[in-house]
Amino acid sequence: MKNWIMTALVALTGCGGGSTPTDHAPATLLEPRQSAARAQILADSASGFVCAPEAVTCVEVSSTASSAQATAPITFGQPFRSGDLPTGTALHAQDSTGAVPLQVDGVSTREDGSVRLALLSAQLRNLQPGEKRLLQVFAGPAPGGSMPATSYTVPSEGLSVQATVYKPQLSQVVFGNRNGHTPGTPFQDGEVITLTLTMGEVTETHSVTVTGNLVGGAFTSLTQIAWAFHNQINARANGLFKAIKEGESYETLGLTTREPGRGPFTVNLQTNSASPIRVDSLKAFAAPQLYQATATEQRAALQAAIEQNLKPHLVGAVAREHTLVLPLRNAQGQAHPQLAARVHTRLLDGGARVRHDLVMENAWAYNPEPGNLTYSLQARLGNQLVLDQAPFTHYHHARWHRVLWQGPEVKAVVRHHMPYAMASGVIWQYNLDLKIAERTLAEEATRLAAANTGLMQSGFLTPYFGTTGGRHEIGPYPRWTALYLITQDDRARASMMTHADLVGGVPIHYRDAVTDQPLDLDRHPGVTVRVATSAPADALPAMSDSGTLWSPDIAHQGSFTFVPYVLTGDVYHLDELMFWAAWNMNGYNPGYRGLGLGLLHPEQVRGQAWAMRALGEAARALPDAHPMKRYFETRLANNFAWYNDTYKVGGPVSPLGALVNPYQDDTIGPWQNDFFGLVVAQLAQDGYAQARPIFNWVSQFNVGRFMHEADAGYCVAKAPAYYVKVVKTVDGKRVPIDNWREVFQTNWPGVTCDANLPLDPSSYPGSSLGYAANARAMLAASANAGHPDALAVYRMWVARTPGIDNAFLTDPTWAVTPLRH
């Protein structure tokens, strides 16, 4: 692979009322909104700086060091507008000191052949403490020509990883005998339950008297009994034992030792209740074992990766990065069946400094003994201890990472020219004119410092994804990401990157040991990881310890790592994108998703929206040369094909553009339709021709319900209502309603439109998270994707909902706007 310094070549390698149904079909496909001249965008100072008018784009590099840095090699992701960077175009860079060595990697292209996203690495020199320097990126060869490739040397001191893996006893107490929602034999008021826990000569006794909401045999009361024991056991000072209640554990109570290596114990119970209680043994105690990957093994793996170009991420004169997969072996040379170290090793300055992104995964899909693991971990560079992790429980199918530096750490922050980055269509256009108060950013930092952000913990995230109500991770992007995109403030960045890391603890990560990639439906079309049962040939091994903090789903899923990857280019975030997109497809009953097709329509409409977003994010972010690029592009195309074939003129669907609610096919939540429209609008804007037919179809309902007050009596005040009935019964048959006037009168009989009709209160018209705000984002995205009426409708709706503007100042999650230029 050719290396470039002052010139980087973008090298791509393979890898209305009363109308008839037909009146609602767009006559032509809507095209993307015409974009402004690039120089006009680059002159926008919303990010605090402007780019040279002849540049393609620019970024600001800020030193965070207390002393001068002779060299400051940086890598960042850069989105490009369609057509701005055709395939094969050379790039070069300059800053205030002159020419800057530049390399290009990780190129993702659009259907038109132009670059959507690339990873840029630049070698800045003599960066002073606190200095802010503009890095201008230009198209074409550098005036001085290209420079020779850099020779990289493997450091003499390698990275070693040691994990002491514990196998503490795990017992489980199950209270009662309920059958689903049918109560079992009840616990009566005044009955006493006693648990006696014994280890050697030490005994702990814990008793709970049944009273109040503990009385009964339903899962609600049984859960409260389990919680009563949980709180009592864990509150004991200097106790030996720990109670576990995580996720949807209901009437079950896990029991183990606080120190994982202490030994076995017994559980005895006494009660005067007729309701049954049982004790199950889930895991027997076993002595701890040391597993390790040595520095010698790491150095050899790195040398082989360089010589054979194995698992490359960055290859050029500024930086070279490869992914190393290091099995952890015990004294007998046996690799741990589940725990593995992955190291994204980036060599800089020829290898004089190295950035190791150490990733610990408990994620192999088909390896034996899946389940939660308890271990401590130490990492060393040579003899220097650089990471010392106390014993903790690593959830099944989860991962975490830490960045370790060998040699001087590069201390610099890259800030993007957001007007250009958002104009690219790769990320949503947020309102860069919002003046986010210092108090809001300070509060974000204070809350983050107080949150539990340890390994496998949740921070600001809601572990039970299905919890009702708006929250900060649900939106086009999470609140913390929106805050960062608008402000590029370090405190918002810390919140965004922290939560991008925390979602690694969610048990959705299934890696195929054969491909070393996320579990795919080409190899395993009959697998399911979430519901129902896999086909025998694709069945996953059973887990003995699967309780976690988390209960993930698709309908309440955030976009956690797309923007972090787009801005940083880090492999960890790219892998995370793939894991979430894969889990969304792999979770369904195989027959419902079309086996290997990976169809997403069985999910409720909001879930279809977020799953399509995740799938689109993976497909758009993955470099063209990545082995999984074609896989995700194909699944995205499969879903477009299904939607375009299903939602068409003459089909058994709403001719007004409402999607089918799989759980109640006579109604639709307009907000859910808006979620879906928001996503397909972005995919259409970002270059997917297959996205246009389904975008046009859903836009009939999404934009149309704001446009038919005058001609069909569909009052704008009701446009963002909670749920709307869109099906009627005719001669005993259910048929879609085919005109706006009838839809409105079916849902609001006798209501007429006038200026005094208040906005539907169910839309929360003064909230930053309500359905009225959701509609704003959808209308803006639709305008950006080329809908001819959406921009005017957006402006009308903004004027009708002024309270949202103030709400956006503290929570801009839904503050998507039309393009600035």
Feature map (PLM): residue ranges:
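Sec-dependent signal peptide recognition
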Residues: 2-8
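Bacterial Sec-dependent N-terminal signal peptides
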Residues: 10-38
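Alpha-mannosidase-like glycoside hydrolase catalytic domains involved in N-glycan trimming
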Residues: 37-167, 290, 294-298, 302, ...
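Surface-exposed loop/edge segments in extracytoplasmic proteins
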Residues: 98-104, 202-207, 384-390
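Extended Gly/Ser/Thr-rich low-complexity repeat segments
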Residues: 131-141, 263-277, 335-337, 371, ...
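Disulfide-bonded cysteine-rich modules in secreted/extracellular proteins
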Residues: 145-150, 169-187
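Extended, beta-strand-rich, solvent-exposed assembly scaffolds of outer structural proteins
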Residues: 178-268
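Catalytic cores of extracellular degradative/oxidative enzymes
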Residues: 298-299, 303-821
